[in-house]
A protein has these predicted regions:
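Glycine- and acidic-residue-biased ligand/ion/polar-headgroup-sensing regions
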Residues: 1-12, 23-24, 106
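Short, flexible helix-adjacent loops and helix caps
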Residues: 9-11, 89, 146
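Cyclic-nucleotide recognition modules
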Residues: 17-78, 82-83, 89-93, 100-121
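Phosphate-/nucleic-acid-contacting segments
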Residues: 98, 103-151
Length: 151
């Protein structure tokens, strides 16, 4: 319930906003997917914010047992990656091209829920690799975006 602002520290240790996440959004998945410390800070935009905390164990179990939730996570991460690619302004256009032409990225762009469900049943490790790829790519792009804003 409510909205939160997501920010990450820039190289000068000043928090830089990546934007406001609307009600119903999820966050913290990058840390859970990669078993790394969180890279972002979340700040409530009002006194009326309610969040649900999910342990790493429960998160992993949920992703393995609920393909529809995993598919939604995959699409959401892909959309966030795509939105960040649209927001950054690289001097070298090959930077954006590298992500948009990556076979993993293009596969996800075309994947429907049935295809995803079939892949998830046959090869759950591949699904984890897709999620981790998107997560690490998004973190890199977030850092690139913040470094551009700091200049």
């Amino acid at each position: 319930k409510g909205q939160v602002e997501i920010s990450i520290n820039s190289f000068s240790d000043n928090p830089q906003s990546l934007g406001v996440m609307p009600e119903g959004s999820f966050f913290g998945e990058m840390s859970l997917l990669e078993s790394k410390p969180r890279s972002a800070t979340i700040i409530a935009c009002s006194d009326e914010v309610t969040v649900l905390e999910v342990s790493e164990t429960d998160f992993s179990k949920l992703l393995l047992e609920a393909a529809s939730i995993t598919y939604r996570l995959l699409l959401t991460l892909n959309n966030r990656l795509n939105n960040m690619l649209d927001r950054i302004e690289p001097d070298d256009k090959r930077f954006v091209f590298k992500y948009k032409k990556n076979p993993i990225y293009t596969t996800i762009q075309k994947m429907d829920v049935r295809t995803f469900d079939s892949i998830a049943k046959k090869d759950p490790d591949y699904v984890w690799e897709l999620l981790k790829y998107l997560s690490s790519s998004l973190e890199k792009l977030n850092r690139e975006y913040i470094s551009q804003k700091s200049i």
